[in-house]
Amino acid sequence: TICDFSTPDSWVILSPIEQSIKRKIEAVGTPLKDWDINIYRGVLTGCNEAFIINSEKRDEILANCQTDDERNRTAELIRPILRGRDIKRYIYDWADVWLINTHNGIKGRLERIHIEDYPAVKAHLDQFWDKIKDRADQGDTPYNLRNCAYLEDFCKPKIVYPNMTKYMPFTYDEGAYLTNQKCFIITGELVAYLTAFLNSSLFKYCFRDSFPELQGGTRELSKIFFDKIPVLKVSSAIEQRFIEAVDDIQQSYTSQKAKAIDTMFFDLYNLTANECRIIGFIGIE
């Protein structure tokens, strides 16, 4: 057994073959901090019980709108939201919850939401006035969410993952969902391919211990740890193969499809049959 003391961050005990596999990955990979990607935290409301609602409450708010114009505006304002617990390997289990996205705007690009334009939403939030008026996470008014300069990134293709997790699942979203503060998102280049890599057994085998383990086996997936992960950048032709594979597995998840994507990475990194056998398939279900 070999002790790898090469980084000041952690000491990891590696067998010779484990060290061989990890060196292969690191030799050809580019640290994620040098990729054209952004990693952001989900939306903070300061009062989830007021701003995060189920479909029944959403329908009630829409029914209380006085005009079709108000109803249409309100329907656009209330967005589906994913929470950390909803994220699975490649897929997500949306829990029928919505965010009242009374955002605070983006300076020079997007005007903040004016609650006077949404009377039915205001009536709902007024029920929580004592809780929302003094909360720390608020915008220009208690009705507004705090500033979020990257709000538009939620509408882009993105990776979504929980900030605390035992199983390290990652899913891919084309832009339909916002996320709560228990999630992070990654936007930028090669995000479908990167989703596949982060879900792969290869990633978990090599880099699971790069993320600190907390009580109960939970790991903290903070940006500072992702920055150091080296990942091979690929051509658009190879990227397309992974885009198609991710799309297919999201249509109907099976462990066989996940194993097939694992094999794609084994081939991409030119791992030997013995190295592939050592890694195996790391299930997270």
Predicted regions and their residues:
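Polybasic, glycine- and aromatic-enriched phosphate-binding surface used to engage nucleic acids
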Residues: 2-237
